[in-house]
Amino acid sequence: MAAATNRFRALYSSSRVATPQAGSASYLSYRGYATTDPSSATGGASTAGKRRTTFTDKLNAGPSFGDFVSGGRDNAPLDPSEAYALKTALVGPAGRKKEMTRLPSWLKTPIPDSKNYQRLKKDLRGLNLHTVCEEARCPNISDCWGGGDKAAATATIMLMGDTCTRGCRFCSVKTSRAPPPLDPHEPENTAEAISRWGLGYVVLTSVDRDDLADGGARHFAETVIKIKQKAPNILVECLTGDYAGDLEMVGVVARSGLDVYAHNVETVEALTPHVRDRRATFQQSLRVLEAAKKAKPSLITKTSLMLGLGETEEQLWDALRQLRAVNVDVVTFGQYMRPTKRHMAVHEYVTPDRFELWRQRALDMGFLYCASGPLVRSSYKAGEAFIENVLKKRRSGAPEVSHNTVPVDEATR
């Protein structure tokens, strides 16, 4: 036992490391605990062995604590061009950082997670229905789907599947030359879902189906007819494609019983070849809107343009003049937001005051209604209450409300 104890003591004493004494050479390179006083005369030598970081360098070169408390060295407010300038940030690990565009605070929206959102999503999945809200990654989905009850919610049903035959540079909907065949039960299922929700106003849209002889126009029309059979008082807006310029098919949809015929020109004429699929042209879209109005003059016709793609003021003026020339009633303006890195980049973030300016200009040109704001989309609910009111007054024969009575904040919500 004594021998074992002696061996243990020998091993213990040989493994001990002497603690450096203050003033010795070894003490200068000794790394102490976090409580070691860094203000000693040897502090400069001890920091020399520590790894400096970029963050530390930036912090040391930045404003002092006094500047932070006082609000900074320059308290002058930013002008709008500075406040809403296109900003970027480097994201990712060192050596592989990528420059990404940062959204202004007024373009950020909450992640959808309300009970009504989940309930509405479950209903759609149960009936095998798709919405453009999800497929196009609309930023307003939490607002439109998150109402307190289903009657207050707005969902834009996307017909004819979730795969488009075209590939516009701004759109995140899936594309294929040969998408799946149409679901013959979709018109009935769509009508059932809409009648179940008890909505007063519904928006239907679709992918482009250039693989079909009629572009899917008869499928679209059948859906509208079945909705009107199940819910005669519901107001139906249809946001359609251009049917490859086949105006006869435009008439089929326009005479199916819908109340609002919408077709988006998306951007100004000069940018159309760079933004939309090569099979879509600005003039073809104008002919679609004109044909819908001629097929049923009582229809409200509607279109939408994205801003922030690099358009000029004169190009926007020209687009609005051409739209009024074919008697388009409603126009909406919204900010283009890049859905993924594969899509075309944002040229600029347009300020809210510019959206308001174009709203007023559109109304002054004679448009019945204009919804204009960074988060406004063609089927956003901001305009539906007004359009619904106009349609009901037309049915009853009452005079329509002048567009000058529309509150400014309603169009930019």
Curated annotation (Swiss-Prot):
Pfam families: LIAS_N, Radical_SAM. Pathway: Protein modification; protein lipoylation via endogenous pathway; protein N(6)-(lipoyl)lysine from octanoyl-[acyl-carrier-protein]: step 2/2. InterPro entries: Aldolase_TIM, Elp3/MiaA/NifB-like_rSAM, LIAS_N, Lipoyl_synth, rSAM. It comes from the Eukaryota. It is an enzyme of class 2 (transferase). It catalyses: [[Fe-S] cluster scaffold protein carrying a second [4Fe-4S](2+) cluster] + N(6)-octanoyl-L-lysyl-[protein] + 2 oxidized [2Fe-2S]-[ferredoxin] + 2 S-adenosyl-L-methionine + 4 H(+) = [[Fe-S] cluster scaffold protein] + N(6)-[(R)-dihydrolipoyl]-L-lysyl-[protein] + 4 Fe(3+) + 2 hydrogen sulfide + 2 5'-deoxyadenosine + 2 L-methionine + 2 reduced [2Fe-2S]-[ferredoxin]. Residues 1-33 form a transit peptide. One of its GO terms (molecular function) is metal ion binding. CDD domains: Radical_SAM (cd01335). It is found in: Mitochondrion. One of its GO terms (cellular component) is mitochondrion. Binds 2 [4Fe-4S] clusters per subunit. One cluster is coordinated with 3 cysteines and an exchangeable S-adenosyl-L-methionine. PANTHER family: LIPOYL SYNTHASE, LIPOYL SYNTHASE, MITOCHONDRIAL. NCBIfam families: lipA (TIGR00510), PRK05481.1 (NF004019), PRK12928.1 (NF009544). This is Lipoyl synthase, mitochondrial.
